[in-house]
Structures are given as structure tokens and as C-alpha cells.
């Protein structure tokens, strides 16, 4: 689980080496959506700082002299094709690291730092499967905020969310008093779901939350129509709201249910004939 959330920085071996400061040796199999990266955070929210969602990576390995200078293309990526290079830069220890455009899939991209782990005696990262949070205090406030909203108590919901935001905007409020504070008029189920992202991204099972609140189809549609990735292999496709809201019941469970017929969920039925 931990390695899935951490990009595969080790593939940039000229400039990067495994270390605790970058989350160890990840394999980059889980990504934040465009909505999370660009659509939900306000200025000054520490939950979006580079310490929590890392967007800039710095060289932690002194590159060899013949590897330190690279070409950069018009889009700001490392480019090997000289015809597309618009400038040359030399990277040293502590400088910003650049990657090829193709590497944004799993090597370098904005990511949550919650899952980083590194053991110098296990450089490859075999032991990065560790305890995971099931629930923490912040989620108790978010659940109560949702319950209060459903009871018609939007002010109570705002009060609960503001407890979290008093922490998230504490430093920024020194220059912008009141930053991040919400009122009853701000509260909706969409706002609460967004606040759950801001607070719990990478921790909760998001699909279950969206199923529980009846918002899975709406959120998938929003991702497809407004926040879709440019690359086909990064997009959501094939979602059918008539089928995919629920998951299939395993055939073994249906067969073991002897006293009554256990109906398969719609869309997953198998013809017995």
C-alpha cells in the first residue's frame, strides 16, 4: 500500500536516491485526480503544502558531470530530442528535478506524502507494508458535520469543519485573518465530501464514502466531464451507473447460501443455462 502512493523516483537514478525524505522506494501505482491537485484547495491551506502534497522534487544525489546538464522543452520537461530543446540547465544537489513528459505517469507527479516509509536496511522497500490508519480524530468531526447537515443543522456542521480548518489555516491566518473559515451557507454534501478529500486523501476508502452518500455516479461524471486527464490511460472510462454503483457478490457466497436464493446485484447476473 505505501509503495503504491509514492512515485517511482528511483527511475531518475542520475539525480535521485532512495531516502526517508522522499518516502522511500515507491512504485507509483496510485495517483491523485486533477480535481484533487488543482480544484479543491484554498490559498494558505497547509494540507496542500509541499510537505503534504509534494509537487516539487529536489535532487538528493550529486549527479555525475556528464549527466548533470539536460535539455528542457517548451512544456518545461526534460527533453532528449535536441530539435525540441528550448534551453539547457545544469542540475546539482538540492536543485529542482525535471522528468520526461512520459514519466509523469508513475515517476514524478503531485502525490500525498502520507505513505512515505524508508528503512536503510531494506533499500528496495519490501517492508513498506505497515499499519494503516482506520480512523483518526479529524474524521469524527467530519462524520458529525455530515450528520448535523442531514439533520438540518448547517451551523453545527460548519462549526465542526472549522475545528479542522483552525489547524489547517493557522499559519496563514497570521497574514490573512479569517482565511479558510466557513459558515452555514457554505455547507452542502458536496462541500463535506470535498473537505473529506482535503483532510483524508489517501486514507479513507473513497469509493465506499461515495457509495454511502449516494454520490458515486455524480462524482465519476464530474471527473469525466470537467477534470479528465489528457492521456487516455489516466482517464475513467466504462462506468455504468446502472451497474457499477454496487460490486458483484462472489459466486462462492451465492452458492453457500443454502436456505434462500441470494440474488446477484444488477448487471452481474450469470445465465445458468
Which positions does each model-derived feature cover?
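Acidic/serine-rich, low-complexity amphipathic helices located in mid- to C-terminal regulatory regions
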Residues: 1, 185-224
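Short, surface-exposed recognition loops and adjoining beta-strand edges that mediate ligand/DNA contacts
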Residues: 1-12, 171-187, 191, 208, ...
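Elongated scaffold/linker segments in the mid-to-C-terminal portions of large proteins
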Residues: 1-136, 220-273
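Extended, hydrophobic/aromatic-rich amphipathic alpha-helical segments that build helical scaffolds
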Residues: 45, 131-167, 189-199, 203, ...
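Short loop/turn segments at secondary-structure transitions that flank enzyme active sites
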Residues: 54-57, 170, 198, 216
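Short, contiguous acidic/charged loop-to-helix segments that flank catalytic cores in large enzymes
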Residues: 124-134, 147-150, 178-184
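Catalytic lumenal/periplasmic loop and adjoining terminal transmembrane helix
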Residues: 167-168, 219
Amino acid at each position: 500500500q505505501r509503495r503504491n502512493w509514492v512515485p517511482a523516483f528511483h527511475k531518475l537514478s542520475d539525480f535521485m536516491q532512495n531516502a526517508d525524505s522522499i518516502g522511500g522506494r515507491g512504485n507509483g501505482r496510485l495517483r491523485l485526480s486533477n480535481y484533487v491537485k488543482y480544484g479543491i484547495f484554498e490559498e494558505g491551506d497547509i494540507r496542500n503544502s509541499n510537505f503534504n502534497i509534494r509537487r516539487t522534487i529536489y535532487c538528493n544525489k550529486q549527479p555525475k558531470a556528464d549527466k548533470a546538464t539536460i535539455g528542457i522543452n517548451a512544456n518545461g520537461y526534460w527533453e532528449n530530442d535536441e530539435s525540441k530543446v528550448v534551453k539547457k540547465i545544469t542540475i546539482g544537489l538540492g536543485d529542482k528535478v525535471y522528468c520526461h513528459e512520459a514519466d509523469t505517469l508513475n515517476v514524478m507527479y503531485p502525490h500525498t506524502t502520507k505513505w512515505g516509509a524508508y528503512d536503510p536496511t531494506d533499500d528496495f522497500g519490501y517492508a513498506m507494508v505497515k499499519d494503516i490508519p482506520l480512523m483518526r480524530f479529524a474524521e469524527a468531526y467530519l462524520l458529525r458535520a455530515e450528520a448535523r447537515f442531514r439533520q438540518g443543522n448547517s451551523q453545527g456542521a460548519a462549526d465542526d469543519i472549522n475545528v479542522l480548518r483552525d489547524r489547517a489555516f493557522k499559519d496563514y491566518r497570521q497574514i490573512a485573518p479569517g482565511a479558510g473559515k466557513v459558515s452555514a451557507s457554505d455547507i452542502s454534501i458536496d462541500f463535506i465530501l470535498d473537505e473529506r478529500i482535503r483532510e483524508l486523501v489517501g486514507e479513507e476508502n473513497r469509493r465506499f464514502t461515495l457509495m454511502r452518500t449516494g454520490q458515486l455516479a455524480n462524482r465519476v461524471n464530474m471527473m469525466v466531464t470537467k477534470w479528465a486527464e489528457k492521456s487516455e490511460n489516466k482517464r475513467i472510462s466504462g462506468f455504468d451507473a446502472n451497474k457499477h454503483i454496487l460490486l458483484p457478490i462472489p459466486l462462492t457466497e451465492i452458492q453457500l447460501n443454502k436456505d434462500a436464493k441470494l440474488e446477484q446485484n444488477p448487471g452481474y447476473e450469470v445465465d445458468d443455462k
